[in-house]
Amino acid sequence: MEHRIVGPGPYRATRLWNETVELFRAKMPLRKHRCRFKSYEHCFTAAEAVDWLHELLRCSQNFGPEVTRKQTVQLLKKFLKNHVIEDIKGKWGEEDFEDNRHLYRFPPSSPLKPYPKKPPNQKDVIKFPEWNDLPPGTSQENIPVRPVVMNSEMWYKRHSIAIGEVPACRLVHRRQLTEANVEEIWKSMTLSYLQKILGLDSLEEVLDVKLVNSKFIIHNVYSVSKQGVVILDDKSKELPHWVLSAMKCLANWPNCSDLKQPMYLGFEKDVFKTIADYYGHLKEPLLTFHLFDAFVSVLGLLQKEKVAVEAFQICCLLLPPENRRKLQLLMRMMARICLNKEMPPLCDGFGTRTLMVQTFSRCILCSKDEVDLDELLAARLVTFLMDNYQEILKVPLALQTSIEERVAHLRRVQIKYPGADMDITLSAPSFCRQISPEEFEYQRSYGSQEPLAALLEEVITDAKLSNKEKKKKLKQFQKSYPEVYQERFPTPESAALLFPEKPKPKPQLLMWALKKPFQPFQRTRSFRM
């Protein structure tokens, strides 16, 4: 029963559902059964399905050995409701599956859940703000553009530290960062860090970036107690006093210093039920609805424990401060109860650890749309949280240091050297305006021809080049930029004028003829007939 590991990424809950359905349909043993004097081929009992699927889920690294038989029954109810299975008479659509001898079978085709389609042309790119970003509402026609010029000579001037080579300088203060600038830096760098850990090209399919509040991140980093628990500014969002007292009682059992009334038999069970009722009636899970896909995506990294812890750290920073505080106090209580050997059993049917996971998993992680695997996924996440809550709910120091250094760099005083590239970059900014597509095409076609034409003239007028070298360069230029060349030399004759023909030298007298002495005239006899 091999179960492929479903890694992080968008629609992980849907991918897990389809993976489990395919394995269940492909490998669930089918055989002949009798019921009420009738025989049915290729079917299975409810108990057989629970046994087989429970073992599959426990052996899967996507869910883990903490999956209970009750959770397996809940999943089979979802299977029956979604027509993954049907009873022997073909009935389906309701969650009336029970762990008994009732017969079920597979329908001819099993509907796999479709993946949501990505809206076209919608990309939520994480924007890294710069120190000179203009506030919202600035006209698009007056967007400052800083020209950047750098060459080897300027680089040498800025970086030379030899004695006597440092020119006079003066201090330049950067523009004051606003609170909105700092908040945007925290948000963009935090999301970029999370995207890098998850190994995704974009966070848009696992997280709505617009719902991320940068103020929450900053508050969760700096407004903490010595124990690392978030301190709330708004005390009305605190846990009720009676809930906090009940949690302290169980966390410090049996040393309950806050309790003045005497304890009775089963007192700890009533206290636990009080806490469970409060968390169970929250309007939204502690990890919030809009972060559900992000946390489920991180579950695909549990095989790499260190990476998963870092990813959970970042995700928990995105929580509202009141949610993060409630989660911190709850996880501390759950972990202490599980480690407390003096704590009496809080439930006769379950162990303490299993009880904690089953009781609080739904109030910690839950989807708004009731994903069919959310109970199993929540149990998996809560189990990992209990084992690593001290690290997960700490502020990630690497991220904090990186962002603080970035902000400090943008606020830092800089040294300005006369004549260096700093003089150019800090000069009065030029401005740009939006142009039409036709004007853009014209500029793209003809705007680059001016420097090329200047280059061509430089080749033509270069006296250091021989005619042979000049002809070679002109031939290369004509091949690379025929339009510019054609404009300069519209006809072959105009190009030929650059290389006028040299006058042909006069033929010289044959020297050998001059060296021979003149022969005297000799008379010859005429042969006359």
Curated annotation (Swiss-Prot):
The keyword Nucleotide-binding does not apply. The record marks I231 as: Arginine finger. Residues 201-393 form the Rho-GAP domain. GO terms for biological process: cell migration; intracellular signal transduction; positive regulation of Wnt signaling pathway. SMART domains: DEP. It comes from the Eukaryota. The keyword Phosphoprotein applies. Residues 24-108 form the DEP domain. InterPro entries: DEP_dom (IPR000591), Rho_GTPase_activation_prot (IPR008936), RhoGAP_dom (IPR000198), WH-like_DNA-bd_sf (IPR036388), WH_DNA-bd_sf (IPR036390). PROSITE patterns: DEP, RHOGAP. GO terms for molecular function: GTPase activator activity. Pfam families: DEP, RhoGAP. The modification Phosphoserine is found at S160, S436. Keywords: GTPase activation, Phosphoprotein. PANTHER family: DEP DOMAIN-CONTAINING, DEP DOMAIN-CONTAINING PROTEIN 1B. This is DEP domain-containing protein 1B. It comes from Homo sapiens (Human). The lineage of its organism: Eukaryota, Metazoa, Chordata, Craniata, Vertebrata. The gene is DEPDC1B.
